[in-house]
Amino acid sequence: MLSIKDFTSNLTRHARNTEEKRNMVLTILNSTATKREVRNYLKKYPLLKDVDIYSKGQMDRSSVSKRNKYSSMIDNLMLKHSTNNENNKIEDFHLNRPRSDLISKSKLEIKLTDTLRIAIVKIRQFRDIDPTALKGIAFTLYKLIKLGVSPIVLLDTDKEVQALNGESDAMVQKSIANYHQQALSFINIIEKCFHKYEDDNELSARAIRGLFEQKFDEDRFSMTLPELLLIPISQGIVPVVYPVGYMDKGSKNVFLSSEAVLQCLATDLKSLNDRHRLDHDKENLFTIEKYIFIDPLGGIPSLERYKSAHVYINLLQEYEDIVSELYIGFLKTGERDQHLKNLNLLQKLLQVTTDASGIVTTPQIAMLNQTDRFTNPIIYNVLTDRPTISSSLPVDLKKTPLLNTSIIRRGVPVEVYVDESSDKSGLCLDSLLKRGALDLEKLKNVIDLSFRKDLNMKKYLARVKNNVAAILIAGDYEGVIIVTWEVTDEEKPQKIAYLDKFAVSPKAQGSTGVADVLFKSLLSNFENELFWRSRSNNPVNKWYFERSKGSLTVTGTNWKCFYTGKNYPSLDRMKGYFNICERIQPSWNG
């Protein structure tokens, strides 16, 4: 029978949870720029679970906490798979496991109502992070769980791995034991943040040991017991993965590099989910959505951004250029090597889980509360799948902030064909068609979908023939840009670059970053001068305005003219822009 005290306590809990739900919904609405982003988020992530005390007409009066329930379950699981009880003492990190091939073929003993959306969080130099920052990171982890994300934490031990190279086994075991104590201290700190709350609002974490093993006939470590991870995350508990692996050869435990651990997690979890999809009509058991690197150095630095971080990195297009830039010499060797390590590791991980995103930020930024004044880039990226600012915003504008967070995706390749002739005679479209570099059907399709109109291709090609300055194609025509040479009516006519078509397919609009990737590439190829026109009532004009040096209304028309580039146009030049905007005839059917 419920007492008055129980009832009052649960009313308080109900009010707090109701307020938390309200605040979470407001966070989503305030952080997402479009209805599409809200829909995409809610479609992917299960929002706060119903914790109403009136659900099912009764209250859960279990005196066993969620963590204790989990501890019992996991201990039983470990015992079940152990064949030698002597190796299961708490001081020993090795668990005798069943054969990997049998485990991989067995059915996972977990049934979920929602797909788990996993974020793997790597924290570098966690011992040097002050307790206040750790508490802030704990609240970010808590917020992620409430937003439907399942974090897995790895405390980076790469320094230990390097320092122990060539040391005795006894020294390695001593270091592993020391790491164990530090990991428990980390768990204790983040859990203490929530001791003032009831059980349903606590943040629980669990040390996960004995997860990795290298067999005699294998050249890499593998995850032999996925339940060790999936049971806690399915209950909203944060697994803290030990970077320790057992080697059959030599029967010993060794420290693993963060790269080895993360690649093992990414590869083995993906393989497990792929097998699940085969047996369950392509339904996902879980997906890896984010790789979050919390690093004192922050995001990957950019010279263009005055050594602040790249906002967004499209690996398939930018990786080699960024690596080359990091070797120019504007960074200390140690810093450069760490940034390269982060970039290279994320490139490898995103080759395995191609739809995931990487986030590299600092502990101070990772602990930010999501408020009207501050934007936590981790929370914001979960809600929108975008960086906090657009990567195509001009760097030199005062309103464009310099950040220390990089969002990294495998992205899309960008094919760029630019007229490099001295007389600006234009690209030879026939040559591009014969080489298979240009597909007119796909080109027309993406333009039609983007503009919601029917392009008269014959009429359009007749107008731009011998005048095409550039064609940029993102991926498999997820987006295209066509730039033409247009002649001014000045006393000495000149050909200038005019952005004629900028189209992004509806599926690629928003969080994919295709528009930003294309526009950045466009500006890098036409950095001196570029202009374009847009209908005065075009909702995209705000986006254009933020990326242009200026805009003017073309008198007597419904056109707005935008311009950008290093060369500031004279009054006569602007008149030339206006004349071109007025005389170009649309090439639409109907």
From Swiss-Prot:
Keyword check for Lipid biosynthesis: no
A Pfam family matched in the record: NAT
GO cellular component entries: mitochondrial matrix
Recorded metabolic or biological pathway in which this protein acts: Amino-acid biosynthesis; L-arginine biosynthesis; N(2)-acetyl-L-ornithine from L-glutamate: step 1/4
Keyword entries, A-Z: Acyltransferase, Amino-acid biosynthesis, Mitochondrion, Transferase, Transit peptide
UniProt GO MF annotations: L-glutamate N-acetyltransferase activity
Compartment list: Mitochondrion
Catalytic activity of the protein: L-glutamate + acetyl-CoA = N-acetyl-L-glutamate + CoA + H(+)
Matching Gene3D superfamilies: 3.40.630.30
CDD domains noted in UniProt: DUF619-NAGS-FABP
Domain of life, per lineage: Eukaryota
Chain ranges of the N-acetyltransferase domain: 427-587
Enzyme class: transferase
Stored InterPro entries: GlcNAc_Synth_fun (IPR011190), Vertebrate-like_GNAT_dom (IPR006855)
Keyword Transcription among UniProt keywords: no
GO BP field: L-arginine biosynthetic process; ornithine biosynthetic process
EC number(s) on file: 2.3.1.1
Family: Belongs to the acetyltransferase family.
Role this protein plays: N-acetylglutamate synthase involved in arginine biosynthesis.
Protein name: Amino-acid acetyltransferase, mitochondrial
Gene designation per UniProt: ARG2
